[in-house]
Amino acid sequence: MAKNDNELYKGLDDLERNKGESNYLRGTIVEGLNDPITGAIAEDDTKLLKFHGSYMQDDRDLRQERRKQKLEPLYAFMIRVRIPGGKVSTDQWLKLDALADNYAGEQIRLTTRQTMQYHGILKRNLKKSMQSIHDAVLDSIAACGDVTRNVMCNPNPYQSDIYAEVNRAADSISEHLLPKTTAYHEIWLDGEKVVDTKKEDHEPMYGKTYLPRKFKIGIAVPPSNDIDVYSQDIGLIGIVENDELIGYNVSVGGGMGMKHDDLRTYPQVGKVIGFIPKDKAEEVCEKILTIQRDYGDRSDRMQARFKYTVDRKGLDWIKQELNDRLGWELEEAKSFEFEDNGDRLGWTEGSGKHHYTLFIQNGRIKDTEDFKLKTAIKELAKVHKGDFRMTPNQNLIIANVDEKDKPEIQKIIDNYGLTDGKNYSGLRRNSMACVAFPTCGLAMAESERYLPSLVGKIEDLLDEFGLSEEEITIRMTGCPNGCARPALAEISFIGKAPGKYNFYLGGSFKGDRLNKLYKENIGEKEILESLRPILEQYSKEREKGEHFGDFVVRKGIVEKVTDGRDFRG
């Protein structure tokens, strides 16, 4: 490496060097894939692989036993598909379902960003899996990494025309902000190789080192905030007048991740800075992204998210810098009102079509002896003439069903015992968990495998106090990275150690306020003992229509938090 290149990365996080020297995300990934000695790839390449939509993981349930046997960890890979707005055709679903059968343990995991991911893919099957995604006319480019992640939008089963428009916007923003490197096609799809500097790849928007950290964009359409718009780096809030989408309020600087022992880190809610016409969304997102590219902290990844750039520079500075880059000014924000951040479960109707939102607990699609969920959805895909939409709450919408086809869809739903969640408590319907153990390397505690059981024990308390039908959001993550957006929930648990969680209360049912630490590093017994008197008090003293999160704030059980800088104080 030349001396001036050494100077280029001096004082920066080492990942900046890795990205900059990677030849636009190639690194030595191909060599690693072809190495038969290990199930892993090189450490630097694992960082680059994220930009291709994949993480290297290992089965943590087996780590100790394999160590005893003097074996390397059971390495496998997760692939996350890029699906802006979460919409797939039934033909695409069938191909993605087959991928799970062939390479991923016959399971699909719906994510909190309206896409799907596969776990347990062995290195020898990684390229074949990527090609299977390509066969479904999809890809996994930028599903992970320091780039714009999967662009979300409100599925709006009851406002189909508006949904179609915001889904097109999500598609267009995603395509516009996609990395331009040809590395993905070269490595996974046997595209033409860039072999010398005379034909060097390029990244006109991102540059060689891409963004300082991941960058998330989502479009919400009031009254539903199901995408948790305030958790996004850029949130676009659709403004509808006379049944027509006229534009978006723009929110900046949201983000959920933090680190337990780094008090400089915190979750944050985005702040609205103005209104834009709908045809300006792509341009505005690009300019905001370039502000983060130029001013985000590349020396400390714990301070590299856009939320810290916004808080460090100030909202007024961000708005002025955006106006300067655009060459025109944002308008004053328009009024809007959110009602909730959940899904419309069961049958809904809009624009002459019917839509059924299927409740899928924590997004896990697999067959068990008693519940053939994966098979059921495959059977639906074989006969359904509309499309499927993955929701931000890890559920699945069977969308665009004609009146004449409703009985056939309902018959499959009934035959397989599928549910709209209405047979469950309001708490379970609004529950969400990240994957955590055994595949996530960051997990400090269980999440997906534990939350259903904990919810069952909390349901006993809800039954006791007559609260079973109350809609209450509850979320759990195995670490503080925030994949299930726990800091926005009315009740949340963030893993601290095996069996131990930080317990938070006071988020908003609308998703527009952060919760607050109530008790630290506690287990199940203390969780239930702590919740009992609060739920009892809520049952007796709540005002009409008052949500649980609002109640605990009004009663002073926790402080109201509307800015992440007050989250820890």
From Swiss-Prot:
Binding of [4Fe-4S] cluster, residues: 434, 440, 479, 483
A single BP term in Gene Ontology: sulfate assimilation
Catalysed reaction, written as an equation: hydrogen sulfide + 3 NADP(+) + 3 H2O = sulfite + 3 NADPH + 4 H(+)
EC number(s) on file: 1.8.1.2
InterPro entries tied to this protein: CysI, NiRdtase/SiRdtase_haem-b_fer, Nit/Sulf_reduc_fer-like_dom_sf, NO2/SO3_Rdtase_4Fe4S_dom, NO2/SO3_Rdtase_4Fe4S_prot, NO2/SO3_Rdtase_4Fe4S_sf, NO2/SO3_Rdtase_FeS/sirohaem_BS
Gene Ontology CC entries for this record: sulfite reductase complex (NADPH)
Pathway: Sulfur metabolism; hydrogen sulfide biosynthesis; hydrogen sulfide from sulfite (NADPH route): step 1/1
Keyword Iron-sulfur part of the UniProt annotation: yes
Keyword line: 4Fe-4S, Amino-acid biosynthesis, Cysteine biosynthesis, Heme, Iron, Iron-sulfur, Metal-binding, NADP, Oxidoreductase
Gene Ontology molecular function: 4 iron, 4 sulfur cluster binding; heme binding; metal ion binding; NADP binding; sulfite reductase (ferredoxin) activity; sulfite reductase (NADPH) activity
Domain of life: Bacteria
HAMAP family, alphabetized: CysI
Quaternary state and interactors: Alpha(8)-beta(8). The alpha component is a flavoprotein, the beta component is a hemoprotein.
Family matches, as NCBIfam families: CysI (TIGR02041), PRK13504.1 (NF010029)
Family: Belongs to the nitrite and sulfite reductase 4Fe-4S domain family.
Identification of the protein by name: Sulfite reductase [NADPH] hemoprotein beta-component
Organism whose genome encodes this protein: Staphylococcus carnosus (strain TM300)
Gene from which this protein is expressed: cysI
